[in-house]
């Protein structure tokens, strides 16, 4: 082989090796440096970044909402409010929901369904004339809003008999201190055992007491303002409200005189209040009053002055439940009222009305159930109501306006928020027109 051939062969080998080395080196360098960056479109990048920020903000909002719902569900952050503290503010358990919230919206409610069965005959043996009735009696929603630790809005909207809507109360509270506050709006008159505490899981019996229907006409609410407070074991409420619309009074009681907040006539105002003492948990007793004119300009110089006073008490201890109330109402200018309305004989408005009741119950499961467990409470109730206790001179009373009620029944609470009540009521009066009843009530509160 010639020298030239040898040199050409070696040159070709060197060139081939160099090319192979270059080809292998370029991909390795490319892998080490990554892909060649592409110059971004500035418009597209801005839109994508804005969309990403919006999605992140939405995700944060969803997370916050989920946390808030979980907090509400679990009750985390609620303010502790004992039964005694709620009662001192005139609040039944469900109505107190807004006062347990730290801030913001609260929703609660209650309802009841009532079956009423009537005897075939009256006390004197004549036909009863009434057929059984099954009523979606009440469905209520409480809506409240705590603006801060001082200001609170509390409202109750009620549907009665499945079709009648009412604003039961609506007021704004200002808590000046922990133990004293101001209240204004459509207020529950602070009288008796039931008017402020009318939830079916609270009062005993399938129906509210007749004394707190005819004389203290619950649920009784009027427009006004006032104060409330509690010191140690004493609590009070004192309001000024519009007076009754007395032209609706009758021989059957004062119930028709309620104005319920609807364009209430306020020529006559009234003062109402109560004071209660709670010596030990589960026990309280006190008195309440109402005083004001009721004519609202319809009787000339007469103002149809109306005064109602009651004494009441409740003892719940070791499974026993004792409740009692006595109420008396006095009406001035009854003669002027009767003449103006052409009422004669036994149809006239009385100068004095009175009524009272005693309820005794015992939870037979109290010694075996834990707190918040099932409760089964048989009870008896004795009640007397007289809407013509004293008549003006020249008028006589009706024998049917003095009624005695004897009731025996039971209530069963599988949980504190649900109650089933069953009772039988015997009704008698001097007119022998009493008609016995058998009632069943299903109630709830939340």
Task: Locate predicted features.
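N-terminal periplasmic/intermembrane-space "pro-region" immediately following the signal or transit peptide
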Residues: 30-112
């Amino acid at each position: 082989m010639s020298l030239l051939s040898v040199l050409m062969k070696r040159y070709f080998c060197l060139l081939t090796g160099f090319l192979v080395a270059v080809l292998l080196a370029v991909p390795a360098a490319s892998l080490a440096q990554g892909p060649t960056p592409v110059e971004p479109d500035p418009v597209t990048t801005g839109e994508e970044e804005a969309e990403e920020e919006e999605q992140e903000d939405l995700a944060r909002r969803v997370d916050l909402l989920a946390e808030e719902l979980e907090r509400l569900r679990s009750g985390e952050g609620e303010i502790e409010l004992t039964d005694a503290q709620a009662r001192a503010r005139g609040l039944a358990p469900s109505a107190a929901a807004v006062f347990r919230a730290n801030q913001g919206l609260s929703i609660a409610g209650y309802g009841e369904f009532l079956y009423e069965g009537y005897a075939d005959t009256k006390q004197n043996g004549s036909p009863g004339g009434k057929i059984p009735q099954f009523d979606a009696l009440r469905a209520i929603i409480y809506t409240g809003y705590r603006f801060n630790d001082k200001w609170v809005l509390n409202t109750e909207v009620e549907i009665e008999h499945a079709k009648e809507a009412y604003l039961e109360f609506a007021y704004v509270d200002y808590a000046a201190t922990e133990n004293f506050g101001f209240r204004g709006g459509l207020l529950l008159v602070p009288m008796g055992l039931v008017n402020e505490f009318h939830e079916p899981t609270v009062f005993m019996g399938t129906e509210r007491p007749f004394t707190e229907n005819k004389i203290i006409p619950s649920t009784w609410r009027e427009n006004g303002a006032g104060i409330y407070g509690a010191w140690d074991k004493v609590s009070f409420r004192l309001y000024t409200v519009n007076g009754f619309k007395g032209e609706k009074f009758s021989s059957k009681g004062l119930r028709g005189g309620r104005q319920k907040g609807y364009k209430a006539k306020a020529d006559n105002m009234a003062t109402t209040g109560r004071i209660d003492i709670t010596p030990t948990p589960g026990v309280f007793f006190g008195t309440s009053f109402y005083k004001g004119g009721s004519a609202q300009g319809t009787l000339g110089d007469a103002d149809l002055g109306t005064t109602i006073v009651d004494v009441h008490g409740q003892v719940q201890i070791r499974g026993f439940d004792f409740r009692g109330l006595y109420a008396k109402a006095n009406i001035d200018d009854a003669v002027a009222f009767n003449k103006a309305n052409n009422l004669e004989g036994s149809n006239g408005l009385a100068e004095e009305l009175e009524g009272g009741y005693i309820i005794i119950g015992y939870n037979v499961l109290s010694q075996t159930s834990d707190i918040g467990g099932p409760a089964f409470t048989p009870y008896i109730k004795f009640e007397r109501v007289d809407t013509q206790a004293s008549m003006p001179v020249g008028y006589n009373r009706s024998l049917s306006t003095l009624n005695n009620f004897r009731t025996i029944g039971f209530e069963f609470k599988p949980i504190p928020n649900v109650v089933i009540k069953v009772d039988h009521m015997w009704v008698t009066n001097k007119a022998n027109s009493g008609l016995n009843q058998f009632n069943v009530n299903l109630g709830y509160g939340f």
